C-alpha cells in the first residue's frame, strides 16, 4: 500500500498553498501595505466603526497599528472574549527606528506627537521602536505626515514582515567596536522595508546588525543576525547567525560559520528572508 501523504505545513515552495488559516486568508485577499490608502481616504473620515474587520485585526499591523484593549479587561481574560469585546476604539502605533538612532529633529517630532496625540506618553521598546497609545484613527494621517517629514515611519513595525532592524545605539561612537555597521544597516533597511517581495512572510522576521564587541543586540534571539568580527586576514566583517527567537517557541540562533563582507549583507539578508518566505510554516502559526 502506498504510504499516506503527509500533510503540508503551508510551505509555498513545496506547493502547500491550502488550507489557509485566518491570517493567511486575509493576506491572500489583499496585501497588508495596501490598507494605508483606506486609512487615509476612508477610515480617517468615517471613524472607527467604519473599519473593515480584516483591516482592523490584520492589515493595520503592516502600518504599525494595533487596537488597544478596553480599560478594565485583564490580559488573562482575553482568550475567553470575542475581539469586539476586547477592542477599544483607540490604537497603539509603533514607529520604526532602524538601529535605534534618532536625530535631534526626529526626537523633537516624536515628542511633539506624543504631547499632541498620545497623552504625553511614548514607549521606547527593547527592539528600538517608539510606541504611542491613545491614538484615534482620525489622527493617523496627520501623525504619518509629521513622521515622514523627518524621515520616520510606522511601516512594517508590526505584522508578518521584516521588523525594525536592531543595531548598536552607539555605533560610530564606541571606541571598542569592530566596525561601524550604520551604513550596512541602512542599506539592509532599504531592501527590507516597504518591499512587496517581503511583504507577506509566514510570521514576523527579526534582524540585528551590529559591529560592536559587546553583542548588545542579543543576536542569539533574532531570526537573522550579523555580528561584527575580524576575518581571517584581519578585515572587519560579520559572522552570520540564523534561526533564533523567543515567544511561544524559544530557540537560540545557530552560527553558520561564514564570514560576510559588509557589502554582501543586504543580499545575504534577502536570501535568508526569501527562504523563510518560501519554506516557512504557514498552516500553524505556532510552528516555526
Regions found by a protein language model. Name each.
Residues 4, 12-29, 38, 42, ...:
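Generic, well-ordered alpha-helical scaffold segments in large soluble proteins
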Residues 41-101, 163-172, 250-258:
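Short glycine-/aliphatic-rich beta-strand segments at the starts of folded cytosolic domains
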Residues 2-18, 27, 199-288:
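Mobile "lid/hinge" segments at catalytic clefts and subdomain interfaces of large enzymes
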Residues 10, 66, 74-81, 153, ...:
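Compositionally biased, intrinsically disordered low-complexity regions
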Residues 2, 6, 61, 68, ...:
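Small-residue-enriched alpha-helical segments and adjacent helix-cap loops
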Residues 81-87, 118-124, 278-283:
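Short, flexible, solvent-exposed loop/turn segments with mixed acidic/basic and small polar residues
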Residues 4-68, 73-74, 182, 199:
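Low-complexity, intrinsically disordered regulatory regions of RNA-binding proteins
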Residues 73-81, 108, 112-119, 242, ...:
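Short amphipathic beta-strand starts and helix->beta connectors
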Amino acid at each position: 500500500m502506498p504510504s499516506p501523504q503527509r500533510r503540508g505545513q503551508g510551505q509555498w515552495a513545496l506547493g502547500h498553498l491550502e488550507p489557509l488559516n485566518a491570517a493567511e486568508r486575509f493576506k491572500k485577499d489583499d496585501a497588508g501595505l495596501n490598507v494605508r490608502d483606506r486609512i487615509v481616504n476612508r477610515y480617517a473620515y468615517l471613524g472607527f466603526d467604519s473599519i473593515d474587520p480584516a483591516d482592523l485585526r490584520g492589515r493595520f499591523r503592516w502600518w504599525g497599528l494595533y487596537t488597544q484593549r478596553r480599560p478594565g479587561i485583564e490580559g488573562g481574560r482575553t482568550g475567553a472574549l470575542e475581539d469586539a469585546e476586547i477592542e477599544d476604539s483607540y490604537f497603539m502605533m509603533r514607529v520604526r527606528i532602524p538601529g535605534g538612532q534618532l536625530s535631534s529633529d526626529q526626537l523633537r517630532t516624536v515628542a511633539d506627537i506624543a504631547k499632541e496625540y498620545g497623552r504625553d506618553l511614548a514607549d521606547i521598546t527593547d527592539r528600538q521602536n517608539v510606541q504611542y497609545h491613545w491614538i484615534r484613527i482620525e489622527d493617523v494621517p496627520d501623525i504619518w505626515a509629521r513622521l515622514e517629514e523627518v524621515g520616520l515611519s510606522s511601516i512594517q513595525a508590526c505584522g508578518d514582515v521584516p521588523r525594525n532592524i536592531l543595531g548598536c545605539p552607539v555605533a560610530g561612537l564606541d571606541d571598542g567596536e569592530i566596525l561601524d555597521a550604520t551604513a550596512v544597516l541602512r542599506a539592509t533597511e532599504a531592501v527590507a522595508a516597504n518591499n512587496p517581495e517581503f511583504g507577506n512572510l509566514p510570521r514576523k522576521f527579526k534582524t540585528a546588525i551590529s559591529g560592536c564587541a559587546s553583542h548588545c543586540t542579543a543576536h542569539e534571539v533574532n531570526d537573522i543576525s550579523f555580528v561584527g568580527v575580524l576575518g581571517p586576514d584581519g578585515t572587519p566583517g560579520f559572522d552570520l547567525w540564523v534561526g533564533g527567537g523567543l515567544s511561544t517557541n524559544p530557540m537560540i540562533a545557530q552560527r553558520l560559520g561564514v564570514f560576510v563582507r559588509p557589502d554582501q549583507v543586504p543580499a545575504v539578508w534577502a536570501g535568508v528572508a526569501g527562504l523563510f518566505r518560501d519554506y516557512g510554516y504557514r498552516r500553524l502559526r505556532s510552528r516555526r
